């Protein structure tokens, strides 16, 4: 399995393309000069395209991925209704979802042969909208509205329209600030990192009565931490055994173990990392974690070790200025 790491650096308007070797080393393949401040990225489900959100002209760019080395070739673009804070796709590669924090909206852009078209749906009134996360069954879009302490739930139709579910939302504790989400491989639980109180919520997607319920909230900060809480990103290993979340003030990655059924998290440790880690990601083997330091202008590669899933640094690499996003493609 070949793996490629992509990092987005908005301050220098660059995408760095790296080959991830089996021993965890990175080899630079390409540096792409992008037409704007590149931030969120996602790889298409068929692994053929990289979609990138850019500012200040709000667009989604599509780059075709070269199969042998992961290099990028510009393929197309489409306008977005708001500044893209987070982008994702449905599991079938038919739609791109864009969340806009500044405009407080989520949008749906159809894909035709991998290329984005004209936006078909925009839902507004989502203050601090920070991500759009499709459920494992490809039916429900979970959209955290950070400033409203709620996660809105929408049903995705076959033609890309969103309709409010019943219930239309779930709420966090006041001041939590729900931000990014991941789902357990068993499709029974979702995990949301809360930016403003640096906690992680465990959501049972459907209990026996059909309700969505928060079954655990866990503080992700060390007990002696007294600074401003500022959590950012969250990811889970492909086998569902280890979960990671980062905080930008403390510049740490918190390591969690996950119970076999996915319902319970436990803190296993804290890994110091690059300054102000805005984004990180995991490789597809579940062996490596790659973190970006927004203020260090470097990325670091960590090996995931042992039953606890603790992190051991393998190397660090200079990238563009202000790196904010990391994605990994297996091909």
Swiss-Prot record:
Report which residue ranges the record marks as coiled coil. Answer: none
Give a Gene Ontology cellular component term annotated to this protein: cytosol
What exactly does this protein do? Catalyzes the hydrolysis of 6-phosphogluconolactone to 6-phosphogluconate.
Write down the InterPro entries for this protein, in alphabetical order: 6-phosphogluconolactonase_YbhE, Cycloisomerase_2, Lactonase_7-beta_prop, N2O_reductase_N, WD40/YVTN_repeat-like_dom_sf
Q: Which family does it belong to?
A: Belongs to the cycloisomerase 2 family.
Q: What is the protein's given name? A: 6-phosphogluconolactonase
- Provide the top EC class: hydrolase
- Please report a single Pfam family linked to this protein: Lactonase
Reaction(s) catalysed (UniProt annotation): 6-phospho-D-glucono-1,5-lactone + H2O = 6-phospho-D-gluconate + H(+)
**Annotated pathway:** Carbohydrate degradation; pentose phosphate pathway; D-ribulose 5-phosphate from D-glucose 6-phosphate (oxidative stage): step 2/3
MF terms (GO), sorted A to Z: 6-phosphogluconolactonase activity
Source organism per entry reads Klebsiella pneumoniae (strain 342)
As recorded in UniProt, its EC number(s) are 3.1.1.31
């Amino acid at each position: 399995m070949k793996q490629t790491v992509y990092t987005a650096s908005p301050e220098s308007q660059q995408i760095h393309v790296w080959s991830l070797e089996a021993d965890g080393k990175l080899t630079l393949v390409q540096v792409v000069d992008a037409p704007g401040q590149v931030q969120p990225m996602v790889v298409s489900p068929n692994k053929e395209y990289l979609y990138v959100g850019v500012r200040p002209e709000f667009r989604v760019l599509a780059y075709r991925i070269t199969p042998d080395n992961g290099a990028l070739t510009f393929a197309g673009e489409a306008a977005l209704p708001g500044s893209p804070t987070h982008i994702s796709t449905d599991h079938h590669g038919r739609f791109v979802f864009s969340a806009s924090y500044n405009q407080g909206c989520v949008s749906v852009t159809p894909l035709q042969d991998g290329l984005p078209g004209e936006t078909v749906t925009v839902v507004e009134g989502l203050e601090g909208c920070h991500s759009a996360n499709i459920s494992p069954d490809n039916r429900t879009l979970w959209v955290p509205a950070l400033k409203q302490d709620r996660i809105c739930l929408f049903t995705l139709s076959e033609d890309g329209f969103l309709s409010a579910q019943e219930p239309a939302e779930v709420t966090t504790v006041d001041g939590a600030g729900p931000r990014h989400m991941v789902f357990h491989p068993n499709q029974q639980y979702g995990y949301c990192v809360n930016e403003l109180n640096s906690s992680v919520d465990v959501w049972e997607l459907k209990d026996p009565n059909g309700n969505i319920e928060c079954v655990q909230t866990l503080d992700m900060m060390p007990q002696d931490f007294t600074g401003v809480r500022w959590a950012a990103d969250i990811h889970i290993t492909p086998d569902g055994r280890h979960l990671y979340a980062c905080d930008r003030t403390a510049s740490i990655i918190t390591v969690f173990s996950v119970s076999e059924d996915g319902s319970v998290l436990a803190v296993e440790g804290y890994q110091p990392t690059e300054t102000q880690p805005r984004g990180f990601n995991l490789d597809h083997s579940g062996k490596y974690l790659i973190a970006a330091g927004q203020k260090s202008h470097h990325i670091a590669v960590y090996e995931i070790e042992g039953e606890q899933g603790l992190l051991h640094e393998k190397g660090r690499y200079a990238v563009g200025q202000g790196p904010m996003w990391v994605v990994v493609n297996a091909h």
